[in-house]
Amino acid sequence: MYRSLSVLAEESDFIQSELYRNSNYIHPRNKRILYYDCTNYYFEIEEESGLKRYGKSKEHRPNPIVTMGLFMDADGIPMAFDIFPGNQNEQTTLKPLESKILQDFGCSEFIFCSDAGLGSTANRRFNSLVNRAYVITHSLKKMKKEDRDIALNPVQFRKLGYSSFIDLRTLDETDEEVFNTVYYKEIPVVTGSMDETIIVTYSPKYKAYQRKIRARQIERAQKIIASSDRKR
């Protein structure tokens, strides 16, 4: 097996594209939405070698690492991956791998999704070309104040499929349907030369979940404080 790894590495792009093509005969792949993310792997060695470079380890290890970028389809099934030097900025890993998907996988019309760390201006611009679009997570804390104020304003939300506006303060969150509904609002913004739309979502169910998590954290903190006081 180990002796075959060098051969597999050389033919990796071909193997991935053929696996994707043939997997469609077993289960038609949902390529309307593609998810992309990166991770890294560390090596217990003392010096850099090849792709193994000192970089920002997700496990905060002081060892050389390599970075892996992975695309998944809308069903969460892996499509394509590639390995990059551990000291390479993750944002720059997207374009070469996505270009392979465009060229070798026959995918040209999809919505690209990633977290904020991979949503550079260059990556967003690349995914606004031709028949592609993108959805990138965005931190409220990093928004402009005027946009953040609009996002946090409880008015002008909608339900999916409805055009009428909703004031979140009027919701009866004890109602099961209301509790399980996700509400949203759209905020048009201009980022440099790009026209974009910020989509703000509100979920009573997720709010209840986060409230429960915070309550448990507060309870644990209080127990730790009480225990510390007793030891004194």
Regions found by a protein language model. Name each.
Residues 1-232:
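Anion-binding and metal-coordination hotspots
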